[in-house]
Swiss-Prot record:
Official protein name in the record: Large ribosomal subunit protein bL27
Single GO BP term: translation
A GO cellular-component term linked to this record: cytosolic large ribosomal subunit
InterPro entries reported for this sequence: Ribosomal_bL27, Ribosomal_bL27_CS
Pro-sequence residue ranges: 1-15
Keyword Nucleus: no
UniProt keywords, alphabetically: Ribonucleoprotein, Ribosomal protein
Post-translational modification: The N-terminus is cleaved by ribosomal processing cysteine protease Prp.
Family matches, as PANTHER family: LARGE RIBOSOMAL SUBUNIT PROTEIN BL27M, RIBOSOMAL PROTEIN L27
Pfam families linked: Ribosomal_L27 (PF01016)
Length: 104
């Protein structure tokens, strides 16, 4: 046979032109949530003002204090803020709003 075909195998490899870079797991940070007491013991407060911002019930609502859906404590009436310890071993804290008459 005059026409003989030779099959040749060409091995072609492409190498990276740029170095591959892995990702890092750092580089994120959340904003501070500004939790904690907004009114101290003995301070005057108006209806609707926030007394304590919290996650979970670290401080429990007392008289004239409401509990929001995010566990925020707020005043239900005007008056003075009063923190009290209660429970066995006085291990829990309750905040109340005591009605206060101003001397005119």
């Amino acid at each position: 046979m005059n026409n003989k075909y030779f099959l040749t195998k060409i091995d072609l490899q492409f190498f990276a032109s740029k170095k591959g870079v892995g990702s890092t797991k750092n580089g994120r940070d959340s904003h501070a949530k500004r939790l904690g007491a907004k009114k101290a013991d003995g301070q005057m407060i108006r209806t609707g003002q926030i007394i304590y911002r919290q996650r979970g019930t670290r401080v429990y609502p007392g008289v004239n204090v409401g509990l929001g859906s995010d566990d925020t404590l707020f005043a239900l009436s005007d008056g003075l803020v009063k923190y009290q310890k209660f429970g066995p071993k006085q291990g829990k804290t309750r905040v109340s709003v005591v009605k206060h008459k101003l001397d005119a």
